[in-house]
Amino acid sequence: MSWKNDLLAKLAQRDKSMETQKDVFLSFQFLSTRIASLERQLDTVQRDDSKKTVLDLLGEIDQLKQKLDLAEDSLKHETAKNKELVKELSTVKNNLNILTDGYKKLQERHLRLQEESKIKFQNLESLNDDILSLNIENNLLNDRMAKLKQENESLIERWMKRVKQEAEVLNDANEALSRSEKSLKPEG
C-alpha cells in the first residue's frame, strides 16, 4: 500500500512546511514590531539631535530590513512550496479515488466470476453425474446386446442343425422313394 505511505508522507511534509511558515510569520511579526519600535526611537532621537544614536539606529534598521526581506523571501518560498504540496495532495486524492473505484469494480467482478464459477462447477458436476449414469446404462446395454447376440447365434446354430437334420431326413426319404419307384417300375 505505497500510495498510503506517499499520502502520509505528503501530509507530514505539508505539516512541516506549515510549521516552518509559522516560524517565518512569527519572525516577520517580531521584526515588524522591532522596526516600529526602532522608528519610534529614531523619532525620539531625531528630536534629541543625537547623531550617534541615529546612525546606530539606522544601521540596526537596515539590518532588520535585510532580515525582514529574507523572511519575506522565505515566506514566499514556503508559500509556493505549500501550494505545490496542496496540488500534489489533490492529485494523490484523485488517484486514490480512481484506485478505490477501480478496486471496487474489480472486487464486484471477482464476486461475479466466483458466482459464475460456482454455477459452472455445479453444472459440470451434474454433467459428470449424467455421463457416469449414461456410461453405466451403456455398459448394461452392451452386456445385454452381447448376451442377445450369443443367444441369437445359439438359436441360429440349433436351427441350422435342425434344418440340416430335416434336409437329411427328406433326402433319405426321397432316396427311398426313388428306389421304391424304380423297383416298382417294370423293366423293359
Curated annotation (Swiss-Prot):
Topological type in the membrane:
Peripheral membrane protein
From the Swiss-Prot or TrEMBL record, state where the protein is found. Answer: Preautophagosomal structure membrane
Q: Which GO terms describe its biological process?
A: autophagy; protein transport
Which cellular components does GO assign to this protein?
phagophore assembly site membrane
InterPro entries, sorted = Autophagy-rel_prot_16_dom
CDD domains in the record: Atg16_CCD (cd22887)
- Assign the protein's first listed, main location to one coarse class: membrane
Q: What's in the keyword line of the UniProt record?
A: Autophagy, Coiled coil, Membrane, Protein transport, Transport
Where are the coiled-coil regions? 27-185
A Pfam family this protein belongs to? ATG16
Q: Which family does it belong to?
A: Belongs to the ATG16 family.
Q: How does it assemble?
A: Homodimer. Part of the ATG5-ATG12/ATG16 complex. Several units of each may be present in this complex.
What does the UniProt function comment say about this protein? Stabilizes the ATG5-ATG12 conjugate which is necessary for autophagy. The ATG5-ATG12/ATG16 complex is required for efficient promotion of ATG8-conjugation to phosphatidylethanolamine and ATG8 localization to the pre-autophagosomal structure (PAS). Also recruits ATG3 to the PAS. Involved in endoplasmic reticulum-specific autophagic process and is essential for the survival of cells subjected to severe ER stress.
- From the Swiss-Prot or TrEMBL record, give the protein name: Autophagy-related protein 16
